[in-house]
Amino acid sequence: MNRPSFIGHYLDFLDDDDAHYPGSDELLSIGSAVGKKLGLKKIGIHIETLLPGRRTSWPHAESEEEEFGFVIEGNPDVWIDGTLHALKPGDFVAFPSGTGIAHT
């Protein structure tokens, strides 16, 4: 029996390890827009695997969307308004829209 298209395993959704901004050769995290691939339209869900020495994005602030992260394993740092904050497994971080809080 085939599983419905809205059930998936994260390993089946990972994109290639080539994410970078146009004009930059800096490799970013390995990720995937899982929500979009599963057909979700009102909530964005992304998987991000953050290798040592990389970041998820360039610094930015959310204007329309809210952003939320949850650390499953490892000890990444989150950059917020120029300051690094250590995270550990089980930590959450949330960025409400319209606050001007810059992060990566």
What are these regions (language model features)?
Residues L27-A33, H46-E62, S97:
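Conserved short histidine dyad/triad with adjacent acidic residue
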Residues K36, I45, R54, N75, ...:
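Gly/Ser/Thr-rich helix-start
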Residues K41, W79-T83:
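Short strand-coil-strand connectors
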Residues I47-L51, A61-W79:
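Short, conserved beta-strand element in jelly-roll/cupin
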Residues W58, V78-W79, F95, I101-T104:
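Short beta-strand His + acidic residue motifs that chelate non-heme Fe in jelly-roll/DSBH
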Residues G82-T99:
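Short acidic-glycine-tyrosine-enriched beta hairpin
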